[in-house]
């Protein structure tokens, strides 16, 4: 399986998971609002501190994004491109988003795919500080209590990454999901199956799904050989030996791809964030 050497030592825990109370939501985010503000107001209205969601429809404008790039120095295994700022309203096709906190303030980690005003399809890592809703966007997924995603410095990758952190204890009767982060160089399918099994879930639904893998090996599409990607999970069901992960990604050349991942051959590059609930 492919492997990318990270600049720092791997931590002892490769699957970080905390029990949560997950609340399903399906709501519309209003035109004119900052995406960051709208999402945190949604969470607050439901007594939550964030969550993992899929966004669809509507439009963004103005907004800004980056795509993967080669690292300029050995302090990271990969990095970000210069910032792109499309003109006009950009129609959102799909995005996966983790809503949490960075340095005590609201923050999100979001990978999306869209069609720009000139008809050009695009995708990448959307910047929280520069993303405004130009037409109402549908938000579906789960909000969480009992833990929240906090951006913390990660010694292995050199990045400040979202990781689930317990906020209030969740006992066996109140918890109905787990918030997770997967660390680098482990197969994404095997790790998700292990996370679900560790929580006692015979099968699980994946919510959100923001991260990166080392290129891609699809069951139904040509492979992606460039190692640096930004990925979202469009649909994920976790079952022992029968997990199905339907993803979309952009690589460091800007090439877009999508398909169902081949189990056992798609290692995590930097991270994967998600919430799992039993089915």
PLM segments and residue spans:
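Alpha/propeptide regions of enzymes that mature by internal proteolysis
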Residues: 1-115, 174-211, 220-279
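Flexible glycine-rich active-site/ligand-binding loops centered on an Asp-His dyad
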Residues: 121-166, 264-279
């Amino acid at each position: 399986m492919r492997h990318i050497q990270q600049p720092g030592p791997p931590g002892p825990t490769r699957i970080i998971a905390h029990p949560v109370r997950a609340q399903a939501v399906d709501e519309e985010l209003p035109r004119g609002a900052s995406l960051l503000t709208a999402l945190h107001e949604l969470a607050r209205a439901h007594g939550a501190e964030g969550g993992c969601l899929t966004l669809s429809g509507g439009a963004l404008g103005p907004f800004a994004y980056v795509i993967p790039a080669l690292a300029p120095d050995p302090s990271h295994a990969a990095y970000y491109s210069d910032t792109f700022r499309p003109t006009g309203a950009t129609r959102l096709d799909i995005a996966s988003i983790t809503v949490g906190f960075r340095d005590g303030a609201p923050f999100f980690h979001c990978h999306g795919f869209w069609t720009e005003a000139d008809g050009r399809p695009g995708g990448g890592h959307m910047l929280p500080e520069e993303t405004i809703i130009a037409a109402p966007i549908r938000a579906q997924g789960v909000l969480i209590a009992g833990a929240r995603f906090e951006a913390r410095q990660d010694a292995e990758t050199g990045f400040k990454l979202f990781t689930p952190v317990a906020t209030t204890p969740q006992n066996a009767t109140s918890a109905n999901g787990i918030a997770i982060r997967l660390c680098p160089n482990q197969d994404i399918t095997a790790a998700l199956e292990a996370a679900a099994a560790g929580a006692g879930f015979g099968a699980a639904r994946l919510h959100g799904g923001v991260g990166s893998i080392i290129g891609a090996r699809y069951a139904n599409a040509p492979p992606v050989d460039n190692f640096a990607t930004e990925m979202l999970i469009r649909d994920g069901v976790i079952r022992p030996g029968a997990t199905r992960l339907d993803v979309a990604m952009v690589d460091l050349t800007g090439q877009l791809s999508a398909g169902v991942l081949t189990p056992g051959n798609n290692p995590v590059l930097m991270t994967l964030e998600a919430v799992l609930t039993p089915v």
